[in-house]
């Protein structure tokens, strides 16, 4: 938590006068420029604290390496506004490689009673994590909202993994919660820092993998629970917002990849709710 506060403070001081070519404010109701680099500080604090507290199991390190890569892609998008399809291609590659090499997946084939040598499992798992990443990215549309939602998810995953005696994953969840919590001091309305794509993609990537790993049966890492029902509930808030926004934009002939003020949070604000009340609702 303290590391996150420190790194976010340093980031704020260093980025006050730096305006990237992509201005995330156009997707928010605020006209004031806010640096979108808070996610970098959070990711650095999370990775350092993970290392300091000895959570260096090879699987976690491998996933962490690709989490850094996806954060870099997000940073480049914050700076240079990468085309959505290029970013999507990178997301597919960066998510699929650790899933395949670590042989971890959602056991979707068992759920539907067919066998494709895990090919379908990897496809579904890749889609799931990419969906989570972009849902977290979408819900980062109002001061403090992505922090509140991501923190709630971390807490729920911590309880789930602790219940299943997955204590290392519980520790990782708490460390991620602390990294996000330190950022809240700078993102609570009125925000001084935004997550940016670098942060939302990093957080979404980590949460997505944690959602799969919580079902891990240590005796055989290739076997996972055939259902994601608890996790679907855990991620219901960002997923519902994502699906509502995408469906609405398609229905009016607008590209889902073009940002706007049509999220559930914006609709609540338009009905007269304050930002603090919207955060409480979420």
What do the PLM-derived regions correspond to, one by one?
Residues 80-83, 131-153, 200-201:
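Short acidic, Gly/Ser-rich segments with clustered Asp/Glu that frequently serve as metal-coordination loops
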Residues 68-69, 90, 94-102, 124-134, ...:
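Membrane-embedded alpha-helical core segments of multi-pass
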Residues 22-35, 192, 266:
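Juxtamembrane helix-capping/reentrant segments at transmembrane boundaries
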Residues 48-58, 76-82, 99-114:
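Transmembrane alpha-helix boundary signature
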Residues 63-91:
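Hydrophobic alpha-helical hairpins/lids featuring a short glycine-rich hinge
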Residues 1-12, 19, 42-72, 146-282:
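Alpha-helical transmembrane segments
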Residues 74-77, 132-140, 184-193:
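Transmembrane alpha-helix interface/packing and boundary motifs in multi-pass membrane proteins
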């Amino acid at each position: 938590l303290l590391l996150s506060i420190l790194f976010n403070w340093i980031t704020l001081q260093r980025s006050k006068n730096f305006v990237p070519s992509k201005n995330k404010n156009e997707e928010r109701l605020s006209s004031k420029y806010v640096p979108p680099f808070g996610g970098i500080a959070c990711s650095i604090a999370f990775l350092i604290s993970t290392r300091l507290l000895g959570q260096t199991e090879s699987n976690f390190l491998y996933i962490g390496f690709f989490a850094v890569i996806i954060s870099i892609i997000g940073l480049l998008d914050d700076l240079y506004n990468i085309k959505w399809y290029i970013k999507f291609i990178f997301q597919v590659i960066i998510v699929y490689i650790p899933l395949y090499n670590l042989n971890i997946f959602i056991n979707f084939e068992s759920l539907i009673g067919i066998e494709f040598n895990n090919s379908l499992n990897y496809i579904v798992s890749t889609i799931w994590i990419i969906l989570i990443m972009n849902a977290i990215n979408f819900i980062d549309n109002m001061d403090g909202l992505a922090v509140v939602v991501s923190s709630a998810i971390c807490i729920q995953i911590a309880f789930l993994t602790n219940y299943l005696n997955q204590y290392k994953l519980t520790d990782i969840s708490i460390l991620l919660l602390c990294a996000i919590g330190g950022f809240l001091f700078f993102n609570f309305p009125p925000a001084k820092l935004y997550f940016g794509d670098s942060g939302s993609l990093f957080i979404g990537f980590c949460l997505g993998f944690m959602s799969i790993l919580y079902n891990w049966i240590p005796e055989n890492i290739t076997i996972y629970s055939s259902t994601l029902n608890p996790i679907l509930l855990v991620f219901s808030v960002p997923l519902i917002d994502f699906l509502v926004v995408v469906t609405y934009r398609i229905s009016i002939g607008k590209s889902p990849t073009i940002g706007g003020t049509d999220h559930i949070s914006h609709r609540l604000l338009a009905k007269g709710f304050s930002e603090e009340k919207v955060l409480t609702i979420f």
